[in-house]
């Protein structure tokens, strides 16, 4: 199988640039419980540094995604990091953590930030909307430093003016 060849080659390869590398085999299987179970058992037996859960967050209902996370995480070693690939909404991250996921990656927070969309506790807001034009309250009074010192009106202005700083502030906020 490919994974066996991958692990063999990985173990034979010296770390690049003096940094230790880690291998996280990916559990696939779409939304089929039997395929995910088979893949998770196969991957769990390999003793890798961590394990990845892939092939989710690509259009299936979120409840089905959450169910597949549970199916896989019941099998994967609890003492290894479990990484859910491509999942990035705040709600999905919290649900993943609740189901035993340790790591996430996704372009969504920065892509949405670059497009004036901010994740907030009240939902997603569009900073290009005129309603923020005269709102001098902080982007997020309970957020990071940049959220506290940046007003919604200022961020709205930056987006309307096409300033790159707007994208940076919004991306930092979303992360």
PLM features per residue range, with description:
Residues 1-15, 130, 160:
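Non-catalytic, usually N-terminal nucleic-acid engagement modules in DNA/RNA processing proteins
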Residues 4, 44-45, 147-150:
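Long, hydrophilic "mature protein body" segments
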Residues 5, 42, 71, 154-157:
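Alpha-helical scaffold segments in soluble metabolic enzymes
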Residues 13, 18-139:
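Glycine-rich phosphate/ribose-binding loops and adjacent secondary-structure elements
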Residues 141-175:
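C-terminal extensions of enzymes
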